[in-house]
Amino acid sequence: MAEFVFPEKRPWEKPRMNRKTVLKNGVRIVSERLPHVRSVSLGIWVNTGSRDESPLENGVSHFIEHMSFKGTRNRSGFQIAKDLDAIGGLSNAFTGKETTCFYGRVLDRNFPLLADILSDIFVHPTFHSEDMEREREVIFQEISMVEDTPDDYLNLLFQRLFWPDHPIGRSVLGSAETVGRMDQEMIREYIRKYYIPERVLVVAAGNVDHEKMVEYFRPVFETDNNFSGENPQRSLPLTNGGVLVTTKPLEQVHLFLGSDAPSHVDKSRFACALFNTILGGNMSSRLFQEIRENRGLAYSVYSFFSPYADSGLFGVYAGTDPRNMNSVLEITQNEIKKLSRGQLSASDLAAAKENVIGGMYLTSESSDSRMMRAAKNEFIFQRYVDYEEVVESIERVSVDDVVEMADNIFGHDKIAFAALGPITEEDVDLGLLALSGNGH
């Protein structure tokens, strides 16, 4: 069978398919035309998230996201849902540490109505007090759900340990205390500060006409008198190593091991992505094979790489029987040491590259993924990043680059370890971590 080779340039990746317009007030409008599809994915993004919140504001970005679908000057919450359902549209929103997005996907012929609904949600939310009280209770339940889900709760505990004095280490949801204090004044003040033109990005991907898109959104954003604010600058996150063990009566112990990693703009991020794939990013990865397939010590075990604008986190997660905790830690450390000492073949690296590249191209066939990718690249690089440019950067990574990355990430004293389950710190073999800390 002949080997399949990706075409040098797919028709929908030509630069002319990607357009960008900057309005007079700084709002950016970006489109990626995919003429082979019938759908359009549209997102209105704000370059703000939980890392921009003060301790008292923690969770306000997420609260705003929830409230935006509850009603506007022109539509009730029910009317928003009814209008979307009437055109077979899918719509949602999400809040991250650095961005907030309100998005939807419809047939291309229904794009004008989706644009009208999302811009109405974004520009004219009402934030009625009775709606706020109901949604506050919903968010309380969301917080409780996370705290009742061990791996999610451990993730929160780990981030507090890793970024102890920075908002990036706090929960996107906020806490019961901060959410309980939020009112209309706090929400409107946050919007005034951060929902400003230079932080706003409108992105569409699919069978969309850029000129018509600009024609619609220009009057929406250039004529709104309340669309201005302060634009506070972000502070650089400082990381912390250490140990945090939280005792809880569970069947398993859940483990997080993590350290500093490259940011979105660091050239070494490609080596880190490949290191992640090789160590614990798929079913043939070293941790999955050794811990799950060969030893049967865990059902869920993986590594992850989370880059941000100016920092990053590389981590390993496993859920295991408390009796096997130290064995899992020892295997994890051994596999990391093997890579940091050069035990990586050219064929293994080539397979990891193909895995990453293949995954990128597979997701490129979704208009939602294309829209989100275009937004990320505009926020980070202020331009469209061609797929071939990414492939070339991945292909340039050498065995030595991955080996150096493994050593850089886990070869210092900023390693953080968090565990949740029926254990205490005395149960952890700290020698496997080369760390010391205080249990809680």
Predicted ranges, named:
Residues 2-7, 22, 33, 77-229, ...:
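Charge-rich, well-structured scaffold segments of protease-associated domains
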Residues 236-239, 290:
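Catalytic cores of enzymes that engage adenine nucleotides and/or redox cofactors via long glycine-rich
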Residues 4-39:
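N- or domain-start disorder-to-order transition segments that initiate the globular core
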Residues 42-46, 118, 255:
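A short acidic-to-branched-hydrophobic micro-motif
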Residues 41-105, 281-297, 308:
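M16/MPP (pitrilysin/insulinase) zinc-metallopeptidase core fold and M16-derived inactive scaffolds
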Residues 264-267, 271-281, 287:
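A conserved active-site cap/scaffold subdomain adjacent to cofactor or substrate pockets
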